Regions:
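Short alpha-helix in the alpha/beta-hydrolase fold that links the catalytic acid
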Residues: 124, 138-147
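Catalytic histidine neighborhood in serine/cysteine hydrolases
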Residues: 143, 147-165
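Active-site nucleophile elbow and catalytic-triad environment of alpha/beta-hydrolase enzymes
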Residues: 101-118
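Catalytic active-site module of serine/aspartate enzymes centered on a nucleophile-bearing elbow/loop
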Residues: 160-188
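Active-site nucleophile loop of the alpha/beta-hydrolase fold
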Residues: 46-56
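Short beta-strand/loop motif that positions the catalytic acidic residue
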Residues: 122, 128-130, 134
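Conserved acidic catalytic loop of the alpha/beta-hydrolase fold
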Residues: 3-20
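Gly/Ala-rich beta-loop-alpha elbow adjacent to hydrolase catalytic centers
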Residues: 23-27, 31
Length: 188
């Protein structure tokens, strides 16, 4: 994931004088992590429902147990007993996966840890947007990001929403207006 966004930033930096990085959910974490690359063209970050804390208790409780189980059965060369995924029941079945693969959840957990570590080093202007009643990402994520980044130009916007995918619901006009105002402010 991180290599993909890094390549995209390099390509954008070669094409444009100013690059704003946007990320939604896991992409929000990747956008934050991408600030490690301090390109001159990189002017700001917008993260939407950045997945620093998840509401799904299975991630905190079940994942470590499944990972431990998988390690044990692999140690005995019994890979056929490993659990590769947990079922997911997404709100947007047309765009979300119906399975959470254990390896991808482990990667997301690592990304959360790495992102937390770099928060105090983020100095770029940043807009943090969070859906108030997001069923996937705990709203404490947005507050933790806001409180821990060093940027002097930071803004936190909580949007009334009961869904995770707020980029295509009834509040999109408010969401996009907030983003546009943030970007326009940075261009002055």
């Amino acid at each position: 994931w991180y290599k993909s966004i890094s390549r995209s930033i390099i390509i954008a930096a070669l094409q444009y004088k100013k690059v704003d990085i946007f990320g939604f959910s896991t992409g929000g974490l990747l956008a934050l992590l991408s600030t490690k690359k301090d390109y001159q063209e990189f002017v700001s970050v917008v993260c939407i429902n950045a997945a620093l804390h998840l509401n799904d208790l299975r991630i905190k409780t079940l994942l470590p147990a499944i990972s431990f189980w998988n390690d044990i059965v692999k140690a005995f060369n019994s890979e056929k007993y490993t659990k590769e995924y947990v079922d997911n029941f997404p709100e947007n079945i047309e765009v979300n996966y119906n399975k959470h693969y254990i390896t991808s959840i482990e990667q997301l957990s690592l990304l959360m840890v790495k992102t937390r570590k770099i928060l105090p080093k983020i100095k770029k202007p940043i807009l943090i947007i969070q859906g108030k009643d997001d069923p996937v990402v705990n709203s404490s994520s947005a507050h933790e990001i806001f409180e821990n980044i060093e940027s002097r130009y930071k803004s936190l916007k909580i949007i009334e929403a009961k869904s995770h995918v707020i980029v295509n619901n009834k509040n999109t006009e408010e969401l996009f207006q907030t983003i546009l105002e943030f970007i326009n402010k940075g261009e002055k």
